[in-house]
């Protein structure tokens, strides 16, 4: 089959893929190629105090991660660090979106003004050495508190 025939075949298939992904909203939320998108999707108050954070991890890096730990600084409405949290989000499979829930104790969701990604002490692709993840991170938040680097 020649290049022209392949192009004629590929164009309708590409159009169908766009139509299918667009129909379900997947194309708009896909992580940029080569990136690991970390999104705070929502906060939810915990009965008895505290805030539950829903994190989405979209792994478009081409690698699965067997180790991924974050150190987060939680700022209150006064701009003061309320607490530091260490979060283990592994495993993060390649080409998947993973939901992880983490509890932030003793602070209401409404009192969280910012979440700072302070450090990523563990970023270990499967069967590889620990690496610097910062260049591949894409941080987002759908909450009133931005996720910053």
Language-model segments: what does each one mean?
Residues 22-24:
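N-terminal signal peptide c-region/cleavage motif recognized by signal peptidases
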Residues 1-13:
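Bacterial N-terminal signal peptides that target proteins for export
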Residues 28-50, 54, 143-147:
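Low-complexity, acidic Ser/Thr/Pro/Gly-rich terminal tails and inter-domain linkers that flank the onset
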Residues 57-61:
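Asparagine-centered strand-capping/turn motif at beta-strand->loop junctions
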Residues 64-67:
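Short acidic/proline- and small/hydrophobic-mixed sequence motifs that coincide with surface turns
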């Amino acid at each position: 089959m020649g290049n022209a025939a392949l192009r004629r075949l590929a164009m309708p298939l590409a159009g169908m893929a766009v139509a299918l992904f667009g129909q379900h909203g997947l194309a708009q939320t896909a992580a940029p190629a080569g990136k690991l998108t970390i999104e705070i999707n929502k906060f939810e108050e915990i009965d008895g105090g505290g805030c539950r954070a829903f994190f989405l991890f979209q792994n478009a890096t081409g690698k699965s991660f067997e180790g991924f730990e974050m150190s987060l600084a939680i700022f209150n409405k006064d701009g003061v660090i309320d607490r530091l949290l260490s979060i283990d989000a592994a495993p993060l499979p390649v080409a998947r979106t993973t939901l992880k829930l983490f509890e932030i104790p003793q602070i209401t969701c409404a009192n969280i003004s910012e979440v700072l990604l302070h450090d990523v002490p563990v970023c270990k692709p499967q069967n590889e050495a620990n690496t610097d993840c910062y260049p591949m991170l894409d941080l987002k938040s759908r909450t009133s508190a931005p996720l910053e680097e």
